[in-house]
Amino acid sequence: MRLFIDGDAFPNTLKPILFRSIQRLNLEVFVVSNKPVTIGKSKLIRYLIVEQGADEADNHIVELVEEGDLVITADIPLADRVISKAAHAIDHRGELYSVDNIKHYLAMRNLMEKIRESGEMTKGPKPFNQKDAHQFANQLNKFLAKNIIKI
């Protein structure tokens, strides 16, 4: 199992949590972004900077991801694409996306986008907080404990 990080929107507060997991479990990690992003220094981490563009990082992740890999992203359409390749996806708030729930999240995302575009609602998601970081850490550790054993 490899770990891919959609690096452009990855919260700084999660970097130490992620780095500890990478080191502890000896995971191969790819941080894919449109600009330089640093999680930490390690031989296990590869930083891949792609061209500027709306879906360049997403497309690169989808191209590289394989069955069983884990992608960390807040981008629901990207999560849908990697799940269709039998990979896994978790967001920054600890939500584990699966074949059972991704279509629901995608439909809700698309509905909210239409509502915002119509001007009826203008605010986006609530600010990232410590509770979110804690939920992410718990979900990541739970997922890794369950899936690293299979390797």
From Swiss-Prot:
Pfam families documented for this protein: DUF188 (PF02639)
CDD domains per the UniProt record, alphabetical: PIN_YqxD-like
Superkingdom field: Bacteria
Stretches assigned to coiled coil: none
InterPro entries: UPF0178
Record-linked PANTHER family: UPF0178 PROTEIN YAII
Family, per entry: Belongs to the UPF0178 family.
Annotated HAMAP family: UPF0178
Protein name in UniProt: UPF0178 protein Suden_0449
